């Protein structure tokens, strides 16, 4: 039986129907008030999952504020995960690496694989999502995704926002910003479909907006992760509006995306 079956039923359905919306509070965001506000906006706007920094106190705070919203915790240190899972996290994520690139911290394929193996050894039954670093060439991203399946990953997440260099205004600029992660989602989805009898779901994240989340689903993703479009806002009503716009954009195309995957 797949470990994904251990997820809350609403989250399982969102993945299976290729309409998952994850709101990312930020791997380095340990401000409990800010994280709670983001989680509440995610829940009010119709998100399926909130991704927060790996801290048991934050998990407990979000669970209290939003009891129906599943929590994913992100870190690059596997030893941090067990306490967060014990506090109520539904799943764990190795990533999001974007926070480290400005510091010059780069994650290679071997390091990501080793982090995955260590996490799986610590938490053999917990759902594990792993981000494929966008700094790798696309063919190496594809190979790493396939290798991560063998290492115990349950979901694969793409990234790419920090490598994008949009130079246009409006919708065209939003598409340019999302191009790297969209390309990764397409390439990795195809690689997993070719290499695996039961391909893992792919989550497309980094640099997405309501304009580009439908493209992510069309590229083969089972869902999307959105961070800065929500967490950079200071007004909760504005956050809710953005999340709701993302939800509507996904729901408008999710039935078509699900049919294409059959």
Model feature map: region roles:
Residues 2-204, 209-262:
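Alpha/beta enzyme core
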